[in-house]
Regions:
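N-terminal catalytic or cofactor-binding beta/alpha core of small enzyme domains
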Residues: 1-135, 140-181
Length: 181
């Protein structure tokens, strides 16, 4: 079986940690592609296209540690709370995820225990090794969804705990012409 997530080791002592929750479109064989066609698994609904490369490159540039998810967000969305209705999505951008419909509590628990919990334990283990970590989560987005309008921003900057650092980061990005929301 493929690793549930990949850890990137730091090349120097730095508080920076970069990760990608949606870096993979992989679905283990036992889930029969969740009833989807291969073309659906190549679309943005299955993963954040390009984020694995971005996480790896940023970790290399900054010599920092990181983590990359190894399963598709359609199997279980590692960027959602356990209580979120979108944890195991039944629809994404107009596409029905057939094998996620009427999921038994046992099947849900199995995905949580086998993918969600180990992934988050891995992040917590990495963060526990850092003093005052600065954490960046990498996501990508599609300029236009099948069921939506065009998005007008180049980048989103979401802040959970450290607004001053995020503001400095935003100011630095704007020097390069990035249009932020």
């Amino acid at each position: 079986m493929k690793q549930k997530f990949q850890v990137i080791k730091a090349l120097q002592n730095t508080p920076l940690f970069i990760f990608g929750d949606h870096a993979s479109r992989y679905i283990p064989e036992k889930y029969d592609n969740l009833g989807l066609q291969d073309e659906d698994l190549c679309r943005h609904i299955a993963w954040d296209i390009g984020t694995e490369v971005i996480v790896r490159e940023l970790c290399k540039i900054f010599k920092c540690s990181g983590q990359i998810a190894s399963v598709s967000r359609l199997l279980i969305d590692l960027n959602r709370a356990l209580s979120s209705p979108g944890l195991i999505p039944i629809k994404s951008d107009g596409t029905t995820i057939k094998r996620n419909i009427d999921l038994s509590e046992l099947e849900r628990k199995e995905r949580i225990d086998n993918f969600y919990k180990p992934y988050h334990a891995g992040i917590n283990d990495s963060l526990d090794k850092l003093e005052n970590p600065f954490v960046i989560s990498i996501h990508s987005f599609t300029k236009k969804l099948r069921l939506g309008c065009f998005r007008t921003v180049d980048m989103g900057l979401l802040v959970k705990h450290d607004a001053p650092s995020a503001k400095r980061f935003q100011n630095q990005l704007s020097l390069y012409g990035a249009h932020l929301n």
